[in-house]
Amino acid sequence: MNRSAWWSLIASSVSCFPVHALQNVEWPEQFPFKDEDFQRFDETPDSLFYEAPRFVTHIDDAAIAALTKYYSEVFPPSNTPGVSILDMCSSWVSHFPKGYKQERVVGMGMNEEELKRNPVSTIFLLTFLLVLTEYVVQDLNLKPKLPFEDNSFDVITNVVSVDYLTKPLDVFKEMCRILKPGGLAIMSFSNRCFWTKAISIWTSTGDTDHALIVGSYFHYAGGFEPPQAVDISPNPGRSDPMYIVFSRKLSTA
């Protein structure tokens, strides 16, 4: 079975619910997507697109609350000695639980002004606590190599930005490298995006397919447990949907 035939079969046979998309998947031997699947309508440099800061949220308040609640359930307890977290594709807000702190929380994004304003990267007067301890400005589509040592992080998060990665396997292999054995990677997404900058395989498919696409990144990157999908949509049909695909680095990787 060729790659396009496999994709057509799997997309038509999985449940209509994203949470079921990664159950009992028979992955082909080779990564089933082609280079053109990762092209975008707008191929101008991403640095230009993200040059001006956008101090807006990209999902609604209910979806944000659902994501924050999920984080509160799966993150290591606040102030756990030695814990490090990386928020990839970060901006001016990370949606971590209020007051959440760790010894090292790194934000990586495209716009420095947004990262500087992140309440996890700035000590606001009197009422807000430091959350981000450092930030890195990097275009993962140009430079997927992550500037961190092996086995550095306990958790990696990515909020509604996995759909912009044009070299996802390179990035996910790097995620595996920098995660500690047993470390958790959480990719969250909705049906909202900058359409012109999202990859074509994303804009031409639906939520269930998206769970399968992200799951394939974990699978073909290697070194991860079988990925799982979770639907945390707070008010189906009334607010933004919210989905999680997550996996842990194998303890032997």
Where are these regions (language model features)?
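Class I SAM-dependent methyltransferase Rossmann-like catalytic core
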Residues: 17-80
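Class I SAM-dependent methyltransferase SAM/SAH-binding core
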Residues: 58-146
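Short alpha-helix
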Residues: 66, 205-231, 243
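Short conserved loop adjoining the S-adenosyl-L-methionine
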Residues: 142-150, 166, 177
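A short SAM/SAH-binding and catalytic strip from SAM-dependent methyltransferases
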Residues: 154-169
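Conserved class I S-adenosyl-L-methionine
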Residues: 184-216
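Core SAM-dependent methyltransferase catalytic element
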Residues: 222-223, 231-253
